[in-house]
């Protein structure tokens, strides 16, 4: 196995480099790859270069050149002269807010209504409600993704496509809401409202 994982890591890195060079379409590729890798935990390998290296962009903030959209975002937060956040935040982060705040809780609601037996539906309400609230408040989506993947793998593919389209929507409209961990209500309020 020692020779397999470096090849997989290199392939993921190649997709990342491709996405970083394609603008808005690259944000679609980024979103699709990111969501597809969530269920196996490999999304960390994919997104980290965008957050911390030149793959996520390079910008001058306060006279200092900074690499990576998250590093740039954090530097801009500290810079009183910032009037608008770095554009690559729209390409590689803001789309997550659409998904964590709206799509994933709606998926929980759809799974609830898809249960035909009302007794079983009532038993799963607490489970699905806790998943939806966790996602909405903190942006942690893995429990919903696993439930969806086990319930209907084809819908998981559709969910990944919707996730990617959220990135495109933010890239086209120029929505630049940064984050430090995930894209739940807490970070939306901190970085998108206040």
Language-model features, listed with the residues they occupy:
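Membrane-interfacial loop-to-helix junctions in multi-pass transporters
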Residues: 16-29, 80-84, 118-127, 155-158
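Transmembrane alpha-helical segments in integral membrane proteins
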Residues: 1, 48, 91-119
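Residues in flexible loops and secondary-structure boundaries
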Residues: 48-50, 54, 119, 148, ...
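Interfacial loop/helix-cap signal at membrane boundaries in integral membrane proteins
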Residues: 21-92
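A near-ubiquitous, low-amplitude feature marking generic local secondary-structure context
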Residues: 2, 15-19, 90, 94, ...
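Hydrophobic alpha-helical scaffolding
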Residues: 2, 19-23, 40-41, 97-101, ...
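Signature of multi-pass transmembrane helix bundles
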Residues: 1-53, 171-174, 178-194
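Transmembrane alpha-helical segments and their short flanking loops
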Residues: 60-89, 105-109, 113, 127-194
